[in-house]
């Protein structure tokens, strides 16, 4: 029996994610937190969580450090997600999100992360060379802590190509700019990230579509542009599609993009068509927005929303 395709998620800046629900949150006041959630976080770890929920073999890697790093690794073990990380001299960061259901706001305070030393960067590159042989897909998600070279993701993309692995890039800033030049298999930018690549904000949906096409012209096979509540655009050799998410009772947007990416990878592995892959992704992003905690949506919640995703082909 042929083994099921497996995914390696890379999180350079893993975190202890704390999400608090505070009604009527505002500045210069003291609040007592009545409900909250503390979990292992970071964009790649969120991706791994949803892939695991959907039954896809997955492993998480990246940097961890200190007591926070130990908490992250232990939390992953408790969730049944294997991890193989490089340990750093510094302490993994803490990210705090305050959700106010009264005002419909979400305030985030994210630590910058520990200083990564050159030998630690080399250690992760060496680990990735060994791990890549065991996987079919690699995701490069999120930010990098201080000390990580701007071209780190670009190096891994080239490494993956040499190993015959499909690399998905979902990052920002210089990591994204260098990364797209290395030609990943898939890239998933939002509006702000497109602006970082092209030096200007896309002008509406048409502007985002044009930028996605330009990324495709570089040789990237699949480009998915996320537009938040306005939906998402898919551009690939199969064609171009736009999808609109269904209405849900909003709780938190933290992890919705990661849930979307994980569900799209799942759908690709299942051999689904491009529009169905996009539907799965958009449904997962919406399902995540309706739960407390990044990446804790269930298969049932995703499947319930798939028929409610409006998807149309873009005819040139």
Name the predicted role of every residue range.
Residues 1-61, 69-71, 315-316:
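Glycine-rich phosphate/adenosyl-contacting loop at the front of the ribokinase-like
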Residues 162, 177, 205-316:
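Conserved phosphate-binding/catalytic region of the ribokinase-like
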Residues 22, 99, 233-237:
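Short beta-strand-to-turn element immediately C-terminal to the catalytic PLP-Schiff-base lysine
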Residues 52, 154-161, 213-216:
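Surface-exposed amphipathic alpha-helices with a cationic face
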Residues 7, 57-58, 83, 167, ...:
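Hydrophobic anchor at the start of a short beta-strand
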Residues 123, 137-207:
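Conserved beta-alpha-beta core of the PfkB/ribokinase-like small-molecule kinase fold
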């Amino acid at each position: 029996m042929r083994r099921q395709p497996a995914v390696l998620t890379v999180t350079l800046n893993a975190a202890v994610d704390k999400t608090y629900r505070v009604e009527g949150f505002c500045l210069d006041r003291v609040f007592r937190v009545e409900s909250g959630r503390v979990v292992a976080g970071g964009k790649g770890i969120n991706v791994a969580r949803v892939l695991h929920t959907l039954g896809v073999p997955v492993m998480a890697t990246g940097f961890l450090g200190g007591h926070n790093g130990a908490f992250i690794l232990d939390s992953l073990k408790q969730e049944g997600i294997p991890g193989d990380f490089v340990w750093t001299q510094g302490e993994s960061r803490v990210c705090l999100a305050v959700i106010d259901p009264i005002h419909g706001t979400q305030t985030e305070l994210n630590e910058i992360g520990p200083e990564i030393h050159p030998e630690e960067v080399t250690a992760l590159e060496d680990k990735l060379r060994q791990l890549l042989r065991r996987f079919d897909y690699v995701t490069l998600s999120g930010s990098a802590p201080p000390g990580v070279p701007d071209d780190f993701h670009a190096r891994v993309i080239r490494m993956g190509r040499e190993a015959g692995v499909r690399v998905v890039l979902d990052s920002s800033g210089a990591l994204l700019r260098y990364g797209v030049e290395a030609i990943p298999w898939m890239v998933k930018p939002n509006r702000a990230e497109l602006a970082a690549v092209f030096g200007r904000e896309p002008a509406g949906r048409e502007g985002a579509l044009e930028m996605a096409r330009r990324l495709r012209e570089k040789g990237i096979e699949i480009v998915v542009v996320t537009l938040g509540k306005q939906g998402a655009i898919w551009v690939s050799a199969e064609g171009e599609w736009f999808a609109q998410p269904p209405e849900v009772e909003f709780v938190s947007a933290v992890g919705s993009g990661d849930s979307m990416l994980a569900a799209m990878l799942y759908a690709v592995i299942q051999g689904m068509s491009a529009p169905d892959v996009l539907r799965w992704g958009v449904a997962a992003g919406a399902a995540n927005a309706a739960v407390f905690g990044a990446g804790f949506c269930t298969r049932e919640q995703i499947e319930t929303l798939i028929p409610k995703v409006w998807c149309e082909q873009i005819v040139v």
